Swiss-Prot record:
Protein name: Transcription initiation factor IIB
Ranges occupied by Sequence repeats: 123-207, 218-299
CC per GO annotation: transcription preinitiation complex
Keyword Metal-binding recorded: yes
GO molecular function: DNA-binding transcription factor activity; TBP-class protein binding; zinc ion binding
HAMAP family, alphabetized: TF2B_arch (MF_00383)
Role this protein plays: Stabilizes TBP binding to an archaeal box-A promoter. Also responsible for recruiting RNA polymerase II to the pre-initiation complex (DNA-TBP-TFIIB).
Superkingdom field: Archaea
Length: 307
């Protein structure tokens, strides 16, 4: 269906997650969303171009090919052919034989255990990435890590959700767009975030992942945006974090908790007070964590608060 036809509101297309045909176009974010389960069925930014660069017409001619760039988060990497949904002959009549061929073609593509695993995992990845608002680059990186984990036999004996969650956690850290293990676990429906962390440690060891630890500052922009505070509050929170690091009081502390405490302090100092409960909900940490961190920071930096 043409983009001009699709941007009118609702259109008929099946959601890959729940099978609903009610897909709605979100004009504000430029996304197609399933009205039934909330899955974003298409990314707001689509790169139809090749993954290579060219610097003159000759290079372009030599490197040109058909098809879209490879996508690691598709079970077949997006390089297989697809039989059209229309299933009509040259005269415009429906062709039942082509419907059967299309059905068997789809079944064959996921007939192996690996293909079935990838199909389930990457469908879950799209749903998870949609909930966490992850960019295309992070989705592809997570799919790459998951594929390596499968090849190394890490998925065997563990749930798809825990390994996939760990792959997303690792991809977010690598891309410096952090999401906490608790956020990922909640989005996946995993009851214990430690399942994600245990699987992540296995990935680190078996895949030799070398990643810098997440800093409290990495969380600040997202938390501040969700809380609706001004740039002054964010700048003050950044200043508090830097001073706390100099004093050595952030060592061994969860970065999300430190960022949350710094924002709590900054919001009060800048006259834009946010409650501990509000910040805890955004940061996915407990109010107790915020209280402990903000008291430690205030004591170390000599800050007097009157909450």
């Amino acid at each position: 269906m043409a983009a001009s036809e699709r941007n009118t509101g609702k259109f008929t297309e099946e959601c890959p997650a729940c099978g609903s045909a009610e897909i709605v176009f979100d004009e504000e974010r430029g996304e197609y969303v399933c009205a039934n389960c909330g899955l974003v069925t298409e990314d707001p930014v689509i790169d139809p171009g090749p993954e290579w660069r060219h610097f003159n017409p000759d290079q372009r001619q030599r490197r040109s090919r058909t098809g879209e760039p490879v996508k690691l988060r598709l079970p077949d990497k997006g390089i297989s052919t697809i039989i059209d949904r229309e299933l009509r002959d040259s005269g415009g009549k429906k062709n039942p034989r082509m419907r059967r061929i299309r059905t068997w073609d789809a079944r064959i593509k996921v007939s192996g255990s690996r293909e079935r695993n990838f199909f389930q995992a990457f469908l879950e990845l799209e749903n998870l990435a949609s909930k966490l608002q992850l960019p295309e680059s992070v989705r592809e990186l997570a799919a790459s890590i998951y594929r390596k984990a499968y090849k190394e036999g890490i998925v065997r004996g563990r749930g798809i959700e825990s390994v996939l969650g760990a792959a997303v956690f690792a991809a977010c850290k690598e891309a410096r767009v952090p999401r906490t293990a608790r956020e990922i676990a909640e989005a996946l429906g995993v009851s214990d975030e430690n399942e994600i962390l245990r699987a992540y440690r296995v990935l680190q060891r078996r895949l030799n992942l070398k990643q810098k630890p997440t800093e409290p500052s990495d969380h600040l922009p997202r938390f501040a945006s969700k809380l609706g505070v001004s740039e002054n509050v964010q700048a003050k929170a950044q200043e508090i974090i830097e001073k706390a690091k100099e004093k050595g009081i952030t060592v061994g502390k969860g970065p999300a908790g430190v960022a949350a405490a710094a924002l709590y302090i900054a919001s009060i100092l800048e006259g834009e007070r946010r409650t501990q409960k509000e910040i805890a909900e955004v940061a996915r940490v407990t109010e107790v964590t915020i209280r402990n961190r903000y008291k430690e920071i205030c004591e170390a930096l000599g800050i007097e608060l009157h909450p």
